[in-house]
Each structure stands twice: as structure tokens, then as C-alpha cells.
Curated annotation (Swiss-Prot):
InterPro entries: SAK, SAK/SK_sf, SK. It comes from Streptococcus pyogenes. This protein is not a protease, but it activates plasminogen by complexing with it. As a potential virulence factor, it is thought to prevent the formation of effective fibrin barriers around the site of infection, thereby contributing to the invasiveness of the cells. The keyword Signal applies. The keyword Signal applies. This is Streptokinase. Residues 72-94 are annotated as: Disordered. One of its GO terms (cellular component) is extracellular region. Residues 1-26 form the signal peptide. Keywords: Plasminogen activation, Signal, Virulence.
Length: 440
């Protein structure tokens, strides 16, 4: 089997491919993967595990949500990739409900199962739901399947449903090929990530290119793919170079079982055998042979020319802080910790009950550590030496019945304006954070 491409052919390849084919936007991954659901839509939360057939082995899956309110476009899919059969419908009483097909649910679970697979040996195939698989609402009501294996869920009023239990799975084995593909269109997409976390680097949108057409068994090497990626990077970001490969994955004719190529060693990808693709002739309607498709998706780390690679063990850019929490009345030490941080911007108070403050380093209460009933007083001491910055936070007991976010420091009659100003720079109210004692 010959290697269809060689380094000597890159100039011709780029002239023929990149010079004449307009890039098209690539498909952006599994469509059913959602962020946090909107409170305005009814949701089915899928939280199941896999049981390997014939064994006691259990496979964990990340939970995901299905929006039961969105309507699919005609002939299209919902956001979760569910076909139009799984769609909202009106009942006899006029209330909206959603019909979920069993096959669609199993397909969504199958996609979730393989979403985080890192090797070709890690694939499992979903067979069916286990006997304990159940759909319930918040009140514990169980929803049973109809005779056609579908489940109809009400979507008004807005509510959440839970699919729990298990699905039966087995190790994936490719099916035998009976009619081998003749020609395979090889498409390519690549994305880049700055190795230093350089915020000035804005990665380009992932674009898809047609590289070439090969026969089953022809090959592409990792060196050739890296050279193609560097060519694309140089055209868009000439000041950057590739440092290492993060991932290389090949999708075969939209098959969810992809080929995962090694990321830590050189490789040669041989065009995979598969069934010949057919497409209906637009005029006659007769099924005719058409080229199959491989999509090679790669991700690389890059570095700006002249920059040093990131060293995970280099702490020279980090500053040491000692944080002490002290009872304002007894002067007893409540809690002490030492932190290394690259940014003094994070030296601000967080509320343990508010996840939006999770990047901040100081606490306005100590409830999470079992030290109950304390809050900020507004008195904060900030001391420096050659190697350490020591922050002492004085805390007092909050009034009975007040929640953990209550601040004694908000009582203007209790503390002087000078004391409040010392506290204010830690609350990011405008007073700059001093970099050294002389700036105070």
C-alpha cells in the first residue's frame, strides 16, 4: 500500500486544495451536549450507568439534559440530536407534551458514553435499557413506556424529569465489511491552543478543508498532518509555531465510533475499510455509488516565536500569602493558611454560598470549615516582609438569625472611615491593592 502523500507534494497539495476550496465551518461536536438548562424549559435529566453484559463491571456516564420544549426544524433535529419523531405534541386537553422515542434516548446515551473515550479500546456499545431504568418527576411519579416503546412527558407546567437506572452495554466490535468502499474523501480540521495561556492569542474558528481523495489502505503520516497544521497556522498566525500535538481523531462517514490516533508518538493512519456509500441520484432517484468520507480532527499546542515553553514546576511568578482569621474580641486564631497565587486581583473576599466568587481567595465566613457564626468586621491588617505578604482578617460573631453573608462591616457607625478604607481595597471598591509596604 503506497503513501498517497509525501512531503515533496505539499506545495502541489496546498495549491490545489487550499487555493481553490473555500473553507466551510465544521460541525461543532455532539449537538445534545448542553450547558445549564433554561428555567423556562422542561428538561429530562439523564443519569444512568452502564452494565457490561455478562459481567459485574459498571461503566460510569456523565449526566446530561434533554430539552423537552424545543421544536425541531422540519426534517432536522432538536438541540440534542433527537429526530422529529421525538418532539413536542398537543394532547387532547390542549396541554403540551413531549414524545420521546426509545431509539433516540439510547442513541443520546451512546454518544455520551463515548464522548470521553481516549483510546480505541475504550468503546462500549449500548444494547438496551436495563430493567431498573425509570423515568420519574420530582414528586416520584413513574412514567411508563407505550406499546411503541415511546414515553410521553408533559412539558407544562415547566418541570424536570429524571431518567435513572442502567443501560446494558458490551465491548464494541466493528461489523464485517461486505462491500468495501472504493474512494474516500479526506477532510481536515484543526484548532490551536496557546501553550502559555497567552490571552493575546485568539484561536481562529475551526475550519474544514478537503485534503485529498484516497483509496482504502492508503495512508497519511503524523508528520504530514503536523506540516499541514503548521501551514494553516502560519497563514493565520505567522508569529506562532506548533510545539506538540494534543489529539488526532478520525470520524468515518459520521460514524460515532471514531478512530483515536496516538498523541504522544508518531503514527501512520491507514484509510479504514468500510461499507461503500451510496447516494440517490437527484434526477432518477436511483441509488448510486458516492465517495465515502473521513474527517481528521486535530488539536495542537502552539507557542509565540521567542517565548519560553510553559514549565508546570516554575513557581517564580507566584507570590506567597499567609492568611489568618482572628476573633476580634478574644484575638484567638480561628484559621490560618498559606497560598501561592499569580494574581493579587484574586485577593478579595468570597462568599462560600455564592459560586460566582469561587476565584477569590479570602472568606467572608468560615461555616464551610465548621467554624460557625462568624462574619467580617471590616478590620483587616496587611503586612509584608521580603518573601511573604500576611493578611490578618478580624472576624466577629454575627447576630443571631443572620445568614453567613451578613457583614458587620456594613454598619457605618461601628467603624471609622480609615478602618473601612483598609478593608475597601480587599473588596475591590476602588482603593488600589498595595504592591509593597511603601505604597500603603
Amino acid at each position: 500500500m503506497k503513501n498517497y502523500l509525501s512531503f515533496g507534494m505539499f506545495a502541489l497539495l496546498f495549491a490545489l486544495t487550499f487555493g481553490t476550496v473555500k473553507p466551510v465551518q465544521a460541525i461543532a461536536g455532539p449537538e445534545w451536549l448542553l450547558g445549564r438548562p433554561s428555567v423556562n424549559n422542561s428538561q429530562l435529566v439523564v443519569s444512568v450507568a452502564g452494565t457490561v453484559e455478562g459481567t459485574n463491571q459498571e461503566i460510569s456516564l456523565k449526566f446530561f439534559e434533554i430539552d423537552l420544549t424545543s421544536r425541531p426544524a422540519q426534517g432536522g433535529k432538536t438541540e440534542q440530536g433527537l429526530r422529529p419523531k421525538s418532539k413536542p405534541l398537543a394532547t387532547d386537553k390542549g396541554a403540551m407534551s413531549h414524545k420521546l422515542e426509545k431509539a433516540d434516548l439510547l442513541k443520546a446515551i451512546q454518544e455520551q458514553l463515548i464522548a470521553n473515550v481516549h483510546s480505541n479500546d475504550g468503546y462500549f456499545e449500548v444494547i438496551d435499557f436495563a430493567s431498573d431504568a425509570t423515568i420519574t418527576d420530582r414528586n416520584g411519579k413513574v412514567y411508563f413506556a407505550d406499546r411503541d416503546d415511546s414515553v410521553t412527558l408533559p412539558t407544562q407546567p415547566v418541570q424536570e424529569f429524571l431518567l435513572s437506572g442502567h443501560v446494558r452495554v458490551r465491548p464494541y466490535r466493528p461489523k464485517a465489511v461486505h462491500n468495501s468502499a472504493e474512494r474516500v474523501n479526506v477532510n481536515y480540521e484543526v484548532s490551536f491552543v496557546s501553550e502559555t495561556g497567552n490571552l493575546d492569542f485568539t484561536p481562529s474558528l475551526k475550519e474544514q478543508y478537503h485534503l485529498t481523495t484516497l483509496a482504502v489502505g492508503d495512508s497519511l503520516s503524523s508528520q504530514e498532518l503536523a506540516a499541514i497544521a503548521q501551514f494553516i497556522l502560519s497563514k493565520k498566525h505567522p508569529d506562532y509555531i506548533i510545539t506538540k500535538r494534543d489529539s488526532s481523531i478520525v470520524t468515518h462517514d459520521n460514524d460515532i465510533f471514531r478512530t483515536i490516533l496516538p498523541m504522544d508518538q508518531e503514527f501512520t493512519y491507514h484509510i479504514k475499510d468500510r461499507e461503500q456509500a451510496y447516494k440517490a441520484n437527484s434526477k432518477t432517484g436511483i441509488e448510486e455509488k458516492t465517495n465515502n468520507t473521513d474527517l481528521i480532527s486535530e488539536k495542537y499546542y502552539i507557542l509565540k516565536k521567542g517565548e519560553k515553553p510553559y514549565d508546570p514546576f516554575d513557581r517564580s511568578h507566584l507570590k506567597l500569602f499567609t492568611i489568618k482569621y482572628v476573633d476580634v474580641d478574644t484575638k484567638a486564631l480561628l484559621k490560618s493558611e498559606q497560598l501561592l497565587t499569580a494574581s493579587e486581583r484574586n485577593l478579595d473576599f468570597r462568599d462560600l454560598y455564592d459560586p460566582r466568587d469561587k476565584a477569590k481567595l479570602l472568606y467572608n465566613n468560615l461555616d464551610a470549615f465548621g467554624i460557625m457564626g462568624y462574619t467580617l468586621t471590616g478590620k483587616v491588617e496587611d503586612n509584608h516582609d521580603d518573601t511573604n505578604r500576611i493578611i490578618t482578617v478580624y472576624m466577629g460573631k454575627r447576630p443571631e438569625g443572620e445568614n453567613a453573608s451578613y457583614h458587620l462591616a456594613y454598619d457605618k457607625d461601628r467603624y471609622t472611615e480609615e478602618e473601612r478604607e483598609v478593608y475597601s481595597y480587599l473588596r475591590d471598591t476602588g482603593t488600589p491593592i498595595p504592591d509593597n509596604p511603601k505604597d500603603k
